[in-house]
A protein has these predicted regions:
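Carbohydrate-interacting/catalytic domains
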Residues: 1-102, 108, 116-117, 124, ...
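Loop/turn elements at helix/coil->beta-strand transitions in domains of secreted/extracellular proteins
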Residues: 95-96, 163-168, 243-250, 343-348, ...
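Conserved alpha/beta catalytic core and glycan-binding cleft of carbohydrate-active enzymes
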Residues: 261-264, 335-336, 342, 367, ...
Length: 653
């Protein structure tokens, strides 16, 4: 297949341009141009192998190089452009607006499925049914349940649709004993506490009892086939309704580890002797699931607790894929099952994906097989991974589509606007308002993505693992056990938060709203970041602001799919452009407590002389306005005053 590669240079600014492709130096010819730019082009033949390239530019006696990191005096091959033939991501995901729901804390639509007091024992305590919806999470919150469920999500679909949401991402929803459900008990079924309980028999644990073998009510609720099948059926109906509204659904895939309650291990002896279930690997050395886990003491059966736990957590047994083809096959079938009829989920978010397996070699092998399985079942399903650090080796077209964008989004914008780390664990005054650090971090970490992956990267300000962004605006270091939950609400700055949302909705990728952020929810890091959605106590102005920014994001193709280029960086100011061939958007963030006069060279993003730039959004410390104001570009420069503590979005007419 013939592939044309183009290079843009300022008109009459360079003498020669070469495409250096897989080591071959190819002259590029001027194909066309306008009064601003010359466009050089070269055509290459693509096969099945990766294409690696950069540009060499000559202007008089000056030679420079251009790669993903930008213009360099010497080329660094680590930043070369790459094309992986056949690699594509779902088109529906590019620029799509995601909404993350931690189900137990979103909305209680069915009180009949609520976890009961002392229904079972989990991590040093009997379960607690929290009856005050607005009560702050306890410091040891994992066994406290507020009653949020999938019926609650169904009840609030009108709200999500009106907000402008395209994709709902659920934290885990499969049978699990914790409220976060990253300790899967049964991958085949939706937890009836989130779904439907149609047969509700048995008693809760007696006072003081820690033996879950006696938790008759819980055992019935999560093993009774009527409850499990009714819950799966309700999930089918929920996905159908979401799809009818033009939205998608993403599930959380926890495949590195499961839970100690899992039927394959059964440390709690919940499934022992139950009809239709075989002995778990904890119960017996003869269990058909023994190879699913790595045991360190072969002499402890029955009831062998020497299994390998993820990071030493005995409630999170690590899955032993290398020694169990049966386990691998099972998980691949799970991956296919939920993206196929009748469930028809639109993709997976993969928990701690780089940790899976016991070697890097096996990890990559597993995800290649996983991608093949999922894409064969549903070619339009997205595969996005939780990942900290350089994702490049997984984003080569054969494993993940993209990642949760910590390094090239959440972390840099948090440092720039708030000066704190994303857990609120550290303050760095040298990074607060530092444009060089911000732009450098963004350019470097974005260079680790393939272009398709960057366009669908999950851009979050907050999530279930980090402090709420609105709390970060108070620039305090703390957690709920050090400063207390009330402190997360104090000294917050909604003006800074609005700047962050403007950035989120105008930056390349898929902006992802963590439930409640749009309603003014605060919170320190886990577990305080998992407060309930404040129904009836919402910050209506912030919801309206999110709705308006989402509308702006969707209105302009340049914000959904356009290129990005930094135009200006100064103390506490950043400015960038998003642009396609025929549409340009300019964004200005001024975090100074004074107005700043700017002269922006906008020709680099394709804004011609005498163009009119129309302001469509202005935020400030008190609120925001959609009142439009026009600015004329003269001598290829946009002269504009950026008000103190503001964010501006301008669109070329």
């Amino acid at each position: 297949e013939q592939v044309k590669i183009r290079f843009r240079a300022s008109a009459d600014n360079v003498d020669r341009v070469y495409l250096v492709c897989n080591g071959e130096k190819i002259p590029m010819d001027v194909e066309d141009g306008n009064k601003l730019f010359d466009f050089y082009a070269a055509t290459i033949t693509a096969g099945e192998n990766m294409i690696n390239y950069y540009f060499e530019i000559h202007s008089g006696r000056v030679t420079c190089f251009y790669n993903k990191y930008g213009v360099e005096k010497e080329n660094n091959n680590d930043f070369n452009f790459e094309i992986y033939p056949g690699f594509s991501v779902p088109k529906w995901a590019e620029g799509a607006v995601f909404y993350q729901i931690f189900v137990d804390r979103f909305c209680n639509g069915d009180p009949d499925n609520d976890v009961l007091d002392n229904e079972y024992f989990y991590i040093n305590s009997g379960t607690k049914q929290v009856k005050d919806w607005f009560k702050y999470p306890e410091n040891m919150d994992v066994g406290c349940f507020y009653g949020g469920d999938l019926q609650g999500v169904m009840n609030k679909l009108d709200y999500l649709q009106d907000l402008g949401i395209d994709v709902i991402y659920f934290n885990p929803v499969f049978v699990s004993p914790s409220n976060h459900k990253y300790d899967i008990q049964d991958y085949d079924y939706i937890d009836p506490h989130f779904g439907k309980i149609v047969v509700d028999e048995g008693s809760v644990l007696p006072d003081g009892c820690r033996e879950n073998k006696q938790s008759a009510r819980y055992i019935n609720r999560v093993t009774n086939k009527a409850n499990l099948e009714a819950s799966n059926q309700f999930f089918i109906e929920l996905v159908e309704e979401i799809h009818k509204r033009g939205m998608k659904v993403i599930l959380d895939g926890v495949f590195n580890h499961c839970g100690s309650f899992n039927k394959w291990l059964d440390r709690e002896r919940i499934y022992e002797g139950e009809e239709g279930y075989e002995n778990g690997a904890y119960i017996s050395a003869d269990s058909p699931y023994r190879s699913f886990f790595k045991f360190h003491n072969e002499c402890e059966w029955p009831y062998n607790g020497s299994y390998d736990g993820w990071w030493g957590h005995d409630t999170l047994p690590k899955l032993n894929y290398e020694e169990s083809d049966k386990l691998t096959e099972y998980i691949m079938n799970i991956a296919k099952k939920w993206v196929s009829p009748p469930y028809n989920v639109d993709g997976w978010r993969l928990d701690v994906a780089a940790d899976l397996g016991h070697s890097a070699e096996y990890n990559h092998r597993f995800w290649r097989e996983f991608r093949k399985a999922v894409k064969e079942a549903n070619p339009e399903a997205i595969i996005l991974a939780e990942h900290y650090g350089d994702p490049k080796q997984w984003l080569r077209g054969d494993q993940w589509d993209t990642v949760m964008n910590y390094d090239a989004f959440m972390e840099p914008i948090t440092w720039f606007l708030c000066g704190v780390e994303k857990h609120s664990d550290e303050f760095r005054g040298d990074l607060l308002g530092n444009p060089d650090a911000f732009i450098g971090a963004m350019n470097y970490h974005m260079s680790r993505f393939q272009r398709p992956s960057l366009g669908v990267a999950m851009n979050e300000l907050s999530n279930h693992d980090h402090s709420r962004f609105l709390t970060r605006t108070n620039r305090k270091v703390g957690r709920t056990h050090t400063l207390g939950p009330d402190a997360a609400n104090y000294d917050i700055d909604k003006g800074i938060f609005r700047q962050a949302v403007v950035f989120q909705m105008t930056w390349p990728g898929a902006p992802t709203v963590y439930y409640g952020d749009e309603a003014g929810l605060c919170g320190w890091t886990d577990p305080d970041n998992r407060r309930t959605y404040p129904w009836g106590r919402e910050d209506v102005e912030l919801i309206r602001f999110h709705k308006d920014m989402i509308k702006i994001h969707k209105t302009y193709e340049a914000l959904m799919k356009g290129s990005v280029l930094f135009l200006h960086g100064a103390h506490k100011i950043i400015c960038y452009g998003r642009f396609t061939d025929n549409k340009q958007v300019i964004v200005i963030l001024n975090t100074n407590y004074e107005d700043v006069d700017l002269r922006l060279h906008v020709r680099r993003v394709g804004v011609f002389n005498h163009s009119i730039m129309t302001r469509v959004m202005l935020t400030n410390e008190q609120g925001y306005t959609l009142e439009t104001v026009d600015y004329m570009v003269e001598h290829n420069i946009l002269t504009i005053k950026a008000p103190k503590m503001s964010a501006m979005v301008l669109v070329r007419k």
